[in-house]
């Protein structure tokens, strides 16, 4: 049996909600107590995976406020920096635990190979999340303007470079 949660439920709670459609997701953000229970779940192993729940939508689909915007946010590109900043740098979990939750456990669960596939990160690179830097077609993110650590410098998939950071 496995259990997963998404980065936004570990980093945000209902106190962070704004009227913007960027904050509309399903399930919605819950209480601080619920957020703390999820964090306890990743610490004690009840939750063994973190999945991004990446749901890109057009600007038009997300510009209708909380009530009428499409459900979902982008999550793939900034999951690691958000979780590294919010959970590892604050000593809630170790870097090894984060890698286990994001990579190792999902890979084992779904029988995925990792041959010649890796990412190179600069864990000291500190920056502000800006939607103009997103490669995803969707830009809806409740994390815009947040300061994070950790920039992906290179991604290699099955021996082929699929991403390389070119600088600002």
For each of these PLM feature ranges, what is it?
Residues 1-50:
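Histidine/acidic residue-rich metal-binding segments in metalloenzymes
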Residues 7, 56, 125:
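Short, glycine/acidic-enriched loop or turn micro-motifs at the edges of active sites
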Residues 11, 58-60, 128-129, 165:
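Glycine/Thr-rich phosphate-binding loops of Rossmann-like dinucleotide-binding domains
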Residues 12-17, 61-64, 131-133:
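Short acidic, glycine/serine/threonine-rich loops at helix termini
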Residues 22-23, 43-44, 49-50, 55-121:
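His/Asp/Glu-enriched, well-ordered alpha-helical/loop segment
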Residues 24-34, 70-74, 142-148:
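A short acidic, glycine-rich active-site loop
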Residues 65-68, 116-167:
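C-terminal cap of metal-dependent C-N hydrolases
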């Amino acid at each position: 049996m496995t259990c997963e949660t998404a980065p936004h439920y570990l980093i945000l709670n209902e106190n962070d909600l704004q009227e913007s459609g960027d904050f509309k997701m399903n399930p919605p953000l819950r209480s601080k107590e619920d957020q703390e229970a999820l964090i306890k779940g990743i610490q004690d192993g009840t939750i063994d995976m973190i999945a991004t729940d990446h749901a890109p939508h057009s600007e038009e689909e997300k510009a209708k406020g909380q009530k009428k915007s499409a459900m979902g946010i982008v999550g793939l590109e900034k999951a690691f920096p958000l979780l590294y900043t919010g959970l590892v740098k604050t000593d809630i979990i170790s870097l090894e635990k984060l890698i286990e939750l994001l990579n190792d456990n999902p890979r084992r669960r779904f029988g995925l190979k990792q041959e010649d596939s890796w990412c190179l990160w600069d864990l000291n690179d500190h920056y502000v999340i800006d939607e103009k830097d997103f490669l995803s077609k969707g830009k809806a993110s409740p994390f815009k303007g947040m300061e994070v650590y950790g920039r992906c410098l290179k991604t290699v998939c099955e021996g082929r470079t699929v991403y390389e950071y070119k600088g600002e």
